[in-house]
Amino acid sequence: YSAEVKFPDPLIRGVLVKRYKRFLADITLESGEIITAHCANSGSMMGLKEPGAEAWLSPARNPKRKLKYTWELVRSGDGLVGINTSLPNAIVSEAINGGAIAELAGYDTLRREVKYGKNSRIDILLESEDRAPCYVEIKSVTLKRENGLAEFPDAVTARGTKHLGELSDMVADGSRAVMLYLVQREDCGRFAIAEDIDPTYASALNAARAAG
């Protein structure tokens, strides 16, 4: 399944100066002004944060927001990469509601950010009266180290490992659980787990798959 993201407002082009403190990025606009944008990505953004990279920003609609821009896209090679990790949930929700993902079709209700497990929230919970609930965890994928191959994670993710354990617990309780990786770039046709970056996560995923 592939999706085209439509932003509510035209994006603004700039050039990356630096990304720092995980959630901040200084970007030079075409006017020459240097602004600080919100970086909605807690990962390492390996290969996507080099100074001088072309960046695309969305303007904040809330005039009271401290940071007036959000960093949405960065150019990597000949293509653009979506680095906003808050977008995949909306993309997948729209795809499910539109019947585009056969494996997740046929449920009566879709809810987002539902509490479950040990102080966690599931990205999407699908429910119907006549079938077990389905817990869907979504991960944003941006890493490409090998031509055509997207990988996850791009840094050690203890939180991701915790989520896998909680999904396994849901399966043990009789529910269905799905781990969905959304690749936010167009230059990859394959996907793999970056076991060398986080072997603990890779092992946890194997255990979760074995658990159902």
Model-inferred region functions:
Residues 14-16:
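Conserved hydrophobic positions within beta-strands
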Residues 21-27:
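Short aromatic-glycine-enriched beta-strand elements
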Residues 145-158, 165-197:
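Nucleic-acid nuclease catalytic cores
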